[in-house]
Amino acid sequence: MSTSDDIHNTTATGKCPFHQGGHDQSAGAGTTTRDWWPNQLRVDLLNQHSNRSNPLGEDFDYRKEFSKLDYYGLKKDLKALLTESQPWWPADWGSYAGLFIRMAWHGAGTYRSIDGRGGAGRGQQRFAPLNSWPDNVSLDKARRLLWPIKQKYGQKISWADLFILAGNVALENSGFRTFGFGAGREDVWEPDLDVNWGDEKAWLTHRHPEALAKAPLGATEMGLIYVNPEGPDHSGEPLSAAAAIRATFGNMGMNDEETVALIAGGHTLGKTHGAGPTSNVGPDPEAAPIEEQGLGWASTYGSGVGADAITSGLEVVWTQTPTQWSNYFFENLFKYEWVQTRSPAGAIQFEAVDAPEIIPDPFDPSKKRKPTMLVTDLTLRFDPEFEKISRRFLNDPQAFNEAFARAWFKLTHRDMGPKSRYIGPEVPKEDLIWQDPLPQPIYNPTEQDIIDLKFAIADSGLSVSELVSVAWASASTFRGGDKRGGANGARLALMPQRDWDVNAAAVRALPVLEKIQKESGKASLADIIVLAGVVGVEKAASAAGLSIHVPFAPGRVDARQDQTDIEMFELLEPIADGFRNYRARLDVSTTESLLIDKAQQLTLTAPEMTALVGGMRVLGAYFDGSKNGVFTDRVGVLSNDFFVNLLDMRYEWKATDESKELFEGRDRETGEVKYTASRADLVFGSNSVLRAVAEVYASSDAHEKFVKDFVAAWVKVMNLDRFDLL
């Protein structure tokens, strides 16, 4: 323990006493606020991927850069790379095809249709946790092999696009005809923090398949892309794996046929690696020493590479031609009898006991081995439904090829949103239902048409609350993760959205707007719905004494019911929308956390979210006609009353019951109930970060700023799916 004499002594020598000792003095070190308060609201999720982390700057235009790309020159270089074996990571059979297919698959395979997060669209495989997942062992080598090509073409091709294109070229170079390729994935420069990968604290913790239906999780174990290839919890039982396979592939929006095609197609080329015990494998890239330069899993088994490589611990080669496309996967699956065995690393796998040695060794042409399969491969033979599909593909290789081509395209493009976001010369012409297709525009309203429509909407008898509510209901389905939802298409008027409980108040305005659309014939219903919001906001601002113009960009179209996959759109139904003070279930997270989740899906910042909630409350845009959060006696006036009254110390808040979901604000002197609120309201006074923003809008000089900020955030939400405006 230091004494005053110690301090005096160090001072006498000219040394600062506080620069002595071994404490970590680097930025971010020490106990953090998250350590003290682990349940702290994650407002920081709204600050992800800002321009401050982007080395290319906010003016960088990827689509413009991509247009300068020598696309077919790039594909030629990728094709050459496939057979340029490197001594630091030798290629199996002289080809990296299997490795690149796995890289693309595992990049795209993190997508979850339930919340739209994950997927290949941001190039997240470069960052933790995905760069160090147990299921991604050795993919660091695949990415490093691509570096010379990325270096050559620079910013004309993103890492995210390059990963998927490399997988496509690997398939094509192996004799397979792919369905096409759409570029347009833009890189980000830091890990996604908003993706819930699960609560487990240890890698490869087993999850029961039923648990996957209750959470947005896409794998049966923490750190896997899909399922444990040795069967659930290393059971070694092919039949028991069927439920897990259906759950994980189903969470990606894949049906049984697509699932069978993807498993078989992905295992037609390449191999797994389990030359020796996994105890020989070193730390993953995030934990590896600095001199490894971003690589991980260095192995001390033999040479550590080539014939001595260890990845999953499984040692499986499925087909006789592992670098050329074939139907051997199904032929071998049904032709031979399979017995359980173990890899050199001790992992459970199966071997064709009655097969000759027909499988080539990846590095010694003089050696052959028997066909081998994963436990989960045999599920395709022993599960009755999977077997029917597998036998059909066995007898009809062309049907298999077609199914895999389409399923692979879906897998690798599922999180890109509508086809209008695709760029490049190989974009397929066919519209696919999972792309949420839209018809071609048939209206081109003039400025005068828009003025006339605004007058018609204003004279329709709809209130400010109804006008704002219907526009919000239409636009707020957007998900930034997979770019689904939004106002374009007017799917609010279609099933299933028209029947959602959260939209009950909003859809009551639809018949009025549909009548205006039909009578005018000048604009789509989608445009008129958004224009209704414009009219509502402008009226509310005018009532507050401000003359504002809410920007409006026409050009939306109206989708048909047959262009709308009801089952997939059901996943967009919110379990909570704090902007409308709506919550359907109380067994999922906290109300305020779900508000952050919704705001993050809408790509909002904390100030944008705050302005929108405050504005929606005073405009009366709540889903059920309740008064929760309506801290004003001027409903329909775009004022900052929500913030002024929330932060007013004259009121004391108490929960109405033990759930602590609803609260009453009572006058401290009289005890009179003045307001009621939800957690989505009170969080703006409770959370220190959100309160700091709320205090800005509650200030006496903030009304005009608040209105301008509300309008800017409102227009942003209305245009989130207007990719044609980019």
From Swiss-Prot:
* Residues covered by region (Disordered): 1-33
Sites marked Transition state stabilizer = 102
- One Pfam entry for this protein is peroxidase
Gene field: katG
* Record note on modification: Formation of the three residue Trp-Tyr-Met cross-link is important for the catalase, but not the peroxidase activity of the enzyme.
Per UniProt, location of the Tryptophyl-tyrosyl-methioninium (Trp-Tyr) (with M-252) cross-link in this chain: 105-226
Per UniProt, subunit arrangement is: Homodimer or homotetramer.
Functional note: Bifunctional enzyme with both catalase and broad-spectrum peroxidase activity.
Keywords noted in UniProt: Heme, Hydrogen peroxide, Iron, Metal-binding, Oxidoreductase, Peroxidase
Quick check: keyword S-adenosyl-L-methionine in the entry? no
Which residue positions are annotated as catalytic? 106
Which GO BP annotation is one of this protein's? hydrogen peroxide catabolic process
Can you provide one Gene Ontology molecular function annotated for this UniProt record?
catalase activity
What protein name applies here?
A: Catalase-peroxidase
Q: Which HAMAP family match?
A: Catal_peroxid
Q: Which cofactor does it need?
A: heme b
Q: Which PROSITE patterns match?
A: PEROXIDASE_1, PEROXIDASE_2, PEROXIDASE_4
From which source organism is this entry?
Shigella flexneri
